[in-house]
Amino acid sequence: METDLVSRLEEAANRFVIPLRMNEGFDEQALLQLQEEIDRCGTARREGTHVPKRAALTLAEPFPAIEACAWLYEGKVRQRIQEAGAMVSEAVTAALD
């Protein structure tokens, strides 16, 4: 897995999670980009022999962060954030499977 790919994954994760953490709202486009980068990492992982430590750590971070951020919000927004967390978790599982 190339360094550039891991950097893009980190950037996508930060672009989605940081605004949630700062209580700035839910960004659907940032979520879609995060899922795309996770999928790219999955493709690279299947073509390679290992997952670099930096990539593994980056893949492990979004779900608990998203789940924790959900409690900053109420109602339908909280529910959507929790759904997004589950979607990200499923994407990571598929990428590493």
Describe each region flagged by the PLM:
Residues D4, R8, Q33, E37-R40, ...:
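Charged, amphipathic alpha-helical oligomerization/scaffolding segments
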Residues T58-D97:
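Amphipathic alpha-helical binding modules
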Residues R8-E11, R15-I18, H50, R54, ...:
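Residue-level signal for well-ordered alpha-helical segments
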Residues F16-N23, C41, R45, C69-Y73, ...:
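Secondary-structure edge/capping motif, primarily at the C-terminal ends of alpha-helices
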Residues L20-D27, G48, P52, E74, ...:
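Alpha-helical rod/repeat scaffolding segments in eukaryotic adaptors/tethers
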Residues D39-K53:
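Short, solvent-exposed, charged loop/turn and helix-capping segments
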Residues M1-Q35:
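Short terminal alpha-helical segments
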